[in-house]
């Protein structure tokens, strides 16, 4: 997320909109005459996806679909969709490549993979310039407290165990 005081958010050419992505009325008019629209909206806490998977499907899949339809309706020239490396599934060793098949292993990754499938279908149907990036773990200011780094630091301070998913051999990269 960009700081509200940064030069990019002060630009008259850039609009950062924080809203429910399903509610297209909140942003539809801003897409008119838009050169590039970026979708970074997401429910992203994997553990919560087991508790309320429909919220993840609503935001990550249906929300991306609603955003895409609105971009097409408003004739947005380019669309950038931020997905997740989680769509590859559990990989213990080796490297993931963007052309390999997705293998979602939890409700979060399934909702992101479903969005990618929808987006790709529109990319070819409407001949739109759409880019999907599969970001990995992002850490920084405004990090949600339930995320791994924040949780691990708090647990270590309190002499509690840190969360380990799977067999603990997975390697994760952070930006």
Q: Can you describe what each PLM-predicted range is?
A:
Residues 29, 48-51, 143-147, 175:
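Generic recognition of short, well-ordered alpha-helical segments
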Residues 93-94, 117-174:
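NAD(P)-dependent short-chain dehydrogenase/reductase
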Residues 1-138:
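N-terminal Rossmann-like NAD(P)+-binding domain of SDR-like oxidoreductases, especially those catalyzing
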């Amino acid at each position: 997320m960009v700081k509200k005081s940064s030069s990019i958010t002060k630009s008259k050419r850039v609009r950062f909109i924080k809203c429910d992505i399903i509610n297209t009325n909140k942003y539809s008019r801003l897409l008119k005459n838009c050169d590039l629209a970026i979708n970074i909206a997401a429910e992203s806490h994997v553990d919560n996806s087991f508790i309320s998977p429909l919220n993840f499907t609503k935001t990550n899949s249906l929300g991306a679909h609603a955003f895409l339809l609105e971009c097409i309706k408003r004739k947005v020239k380019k669309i950038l969709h931020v997905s997740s490396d989680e769509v590859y599934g559990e990989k213990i060793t080796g490297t993931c490549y963007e052309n390999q098949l997705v293998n979602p292993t939890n409700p979060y990754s399934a909702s992101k993979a479903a969005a990618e499938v929808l987006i790709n279908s529109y990319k070819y149907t409407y001949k739109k310039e759409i880019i999907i990036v599969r970001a990995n773990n992002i850490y920084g200011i405004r990090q949600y407290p339930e995320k791994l780094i924040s949780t691990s630091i708090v647990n270590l301070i309190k002499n509690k165990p840190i969360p380990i998913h799977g067999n603990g051999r997975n390697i994760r990269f952070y930006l």
